[in-house]
Amino acid sequence: VPATTVETSAIQAPSKEAPALSQVQAENTEVPAVAAGYFRLHLKTLPAGDIANLGLWIWDDVEQPSANWPAGALSLKDAQNDDYGYYIDIKLSEKQQKKISWLINDKVSGQNLTGDKNVELLAPAMNEAWVDEEFNSHTYPPLEKGFVRINYRNADDNYDNLTAWLFDDVKEPSKDWPKGAANKTGIGPYGAYWDVPLKDAAKLLGFVLLDQSKTGDDMKIQPNDYKFQDLEHHTQVFVHDKDPKVYNNPYYIDQVVLKGAEQTEETEIKATFSTLAGVTKEELQKGLTVKDKDGQEVTIT
């Protein structure tokens, strides 16, 4: 059986206004900035029970991992409030800042109320995460179900004349190209944004960003349709400049990473990825190269 290797490479009508979410969803009340060296964990809700008994147990890349179970957990009665819910700031380790693991416990009974959770720190700039009602973490404030927010940032922060042409599983696909494209909902921390109502059980979001001050193909911010296929797990998506990729985080990090590969049959390789959420077979194949023992590329089917 030859040895193989796998590599990663890595039309006229008034414009329609994009609908706005509630003020709480659209923009948080001002709170103090996250101090350097700290990470802010936002919690939408807390487990049932007396808050005086609830604790946040932390480990991995934090300055002081929790000790003395269960009473040694950080008391959640000291958590602060904002429009999202609660938040608590955690001092990070100076040695390594890749992952924070946590759980909420009952500091009296010792019950683990959430199960073990973790937050992957995708980029050095990442200093916040938002935990939803099911205690799943997000790199952005999750929005109400039935909506997705498209965020677009460009290098000069100029968002004049920008509109979004919407299609696929949106409740109201755009009509009358190009004037029927949706105006932006507003400007937020991740640039211009559009709040888009979705069909029930929506899976696929398609959109094109247009500069209405231009004409023809020059209107398009970039020539390809934007596509996003993981609406089940994400309520905000992020694009920037002329990059055609749609990201599920505001740090524009591609989270599809090849973790390992092994040859299991003469013509078969089993590959393990960090996630395949929202990735098509075609997209995956584009990013993979398989070579035989002589360094010749092998066709992937």
Label each residue range with its predicted role:
Residues 1-17:
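Sec-dependent, cleavable N-terminal signal peptides
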Residues 14, 19-49, 80, 91-156, ...:
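The feature marks proteins involved in alpha-glucan
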Residues 52-65, 160-177, 267-300:
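Short, surface-exposed alpha-helix to beta-strand junction/turn motifs within ectodomains of secreted
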Residues 60, 82, 106, 132, ...:
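Acidic surface patches and DE-rich sequence motifs
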Residues 62-75, 110-116, 170-181, 215-222, ...:
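Surface-exposed loop/edge segments in extracytoplasmic proteins
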Residues 63-96, 171-201:
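Tryptophan-paired
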Residues 83-95, 191-199, 205-206, 252-301:
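Non-catalytic beta-sheet/beta-sandwich ligand-binding modules that flank or precede catalytic cores
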